[in-house]
Swiss-Prot record:
GO molecular function: 2-isopropylmalate synthase activity; 4-hydroxy-2-oxovalerate aldolase activity; manganese ion binding
Domain Pyruvate carboxyltransferase positions: 4-256
Naturally occurring in which organism (per UniProt): Rhizobium rhizogenes (strain K84 / ATCC BAA-868)
Protein's recorded name: 4-hydroxy-2-oxovalerate aldolase
Family under the similarity heading: Belongs to the 4-hydroxy-2-oxovalerate aldolase family.
CDD domains assigned to the protein according to its UniProt record, in alphabetical order: DRE_TIM_HOA
Reactions mediated catalytically: (S)-4-hydroxy-2-oxopentanoate = acetaldehyde + pyruvate
EC number: 4.1.3.39
Length: 338
């Protein structure tokens, strides 16, 4: 009977769904509800991690330190966690977060670039933080290649390494193969995590498959609040885990209430599988491109699906949000020539 560490990402990945505009009252209410529901950890910060607030990624309503301080102040059970992308967030940012009460950090890189995480993982360990490696866009690397990247993060000091399906593009077999490869390649004491998106409507199924293959840490969010069609809906996953007899420690009804009463009313765009978010999973595109691509579509009169599919064809990855407008302009020029 598996025991699972459930990490909620409503207040970090969920930032993408509302353009990083959570108010302090909202995050405090959500964090308090999650804490009372006994989730193991709550991640807080700009959707693109510490110092992600920028023209390229989206300006946050508040600074990370304000969000973190507000959440850390109300937690009694859950760990306060955050995300850092090397090249965006710095060791200085990490130290500031730790001083405010962050106890755990995920250091995220593209699935072929684990080497850029070395400095930040080592710094996190020096701060006595729990630290996980976060291999994003996992569908763009083979299971064997991903396992080698995970071993690098393990060598730098990561306590856990995640298979991160940022595009929501993996099928269940794809998740199974990658989690199995990591579990076989890493030391027994190094944990494996699973983070998926719901773009192909496989958010819960893929999380379940991940656990079946040895993942211990599972990311999920209230009402699936996250980039694209969202993440694994935490209340649905908890219900499925209960049906399977898994130990996750969360209060199912409390999660249901928080999802419906606190999170859904904040969505200015429904977090769901629709023609745009389905196109993200179909094309294998970074889920947080959604709102940027919709803006470009509205500005230039190009079908957002065409933009997303072309981004996938060009193999654009997180950090290349500036290319979305370029793609829209190229498609517009092609239409005008036709």
């Amino acid at each position: 009977m598996p025991s699972i560490y459930v990490q909620d990402v409503t207040l970090r990945d969920g930032m993408h769904a509302i353009r990083h505009q959570y108010g302090l009252d909202a995050i405090t209410s959500i964090a308090r509800a999650l804490d009372r529901a006994k989730v193991a950890a709550i991640e807080i910060g700009h959707g693109d991690g510490l110092s992600g607030s920028s023209f390229n990624y989206g300006i946050g309503r508040h600074q990370d330190v304000e969000w973190i301080a507000a959440v850390a102040d109300v937690l009694e059970h859950a760990k306060c966690t955050t995300l850092l992308l090397p090249g965006i967030g710095t060791v200085h940012d990490l130290k500031a977060a730790a001083a405010l009460g962050v106890a755990s950090v995920r250091v995220a890189t593209h699935c072929t670039e684990a080497d850029v995480a070395k400095q930040h993982i080592e710094a996190a360990r020096a701060l006595d933080l729990d630290v996980a490696g976060f291999l994003m866009m996992a569908h763009m690397n083979s299971p064997e290649g991903l396992a080698k990247q995970a071993q690098m993060m393990e060598a730098y000091g990561a306590h856990c390494v995640y298979v991160t399906d940022s595009a929501g593009a993996l099928t269940m077999d794809g998740v199974r193969e990658r989690v199995r490869a990591l579990r076989q390649a890493l030391k027994p004491e190094t944990q494996v995590g699973i983070h998926v998106h719901h773009n192909l409507s496989l958010g819960v199924a893929n999380a379940v498959v991940g656990v079946e293959e040895g993942a211990y840490r599972v990311d999920a969010s209230l009402a699936g609040m996250g980039a694209g069609a969202g993440n694994t809906p935490i209340e649905v996953f908890a219900a499925v885990a209960d049906r399977l007899g898994w130990q996750h420690g969360c209060n199912l009804f409390a999660l249901m209430d928080a999802a419906d009463d606190l999170v859904r009313p904040l969505q200015d765009r429904p977090v769901r599988v629709d023609r745009e978010t389905l196109s993200i999973g179909y094309a294998g595109v970074y889920s947080s491109f959604l709102r940027h691509a919709e803006n470009a579509s509205k500005t230039y009169g190009v079908d957002v699906r065409d933009i997303l599919v072309e981004l996938g064809r060009r193999r654009m990855v997180g950090g290349q949000e500036d290319m979305i407008v370029d793609v829209a302009l190229d498609l517009l020029a092609s239409q005008q020539r036709a």
